[in-house]
């Protein structure tokens, strides 16, 4: 059983590297086939990162409803991959801001800020949230002054 788990982990890592390599050389269609397969198991680091990358792709395409759907599915999956889940919620907050739903964006960012525990000193989640909250406050102030 230990060998099969290790084999699965190595295969998953290999597929993840392949997907990122495809992205690096603009072979997006091939990359996203692999990422979708990996994201079926969001409990693993590679599956969680793949889910995040699919969410980011939806955001980049301006498909904010799909962003919401995917982030909530990730959250409902029960994954313990909190870094990628938090990064996904940041994208969700960005999608609310893009739609001028500033109070919803603020609530989303504050939820991440208040509920997330960094996993190490290289963890950039809370820094990203702080920057977004500051920018959001500027946007809200500007909107209120109109």
Q: What are these model-derived regions, one by one?
A:
Residues 1-146:
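Acidic, polar-rich low-complexity tracts and alpha-helical solenoid repeat scaffolds
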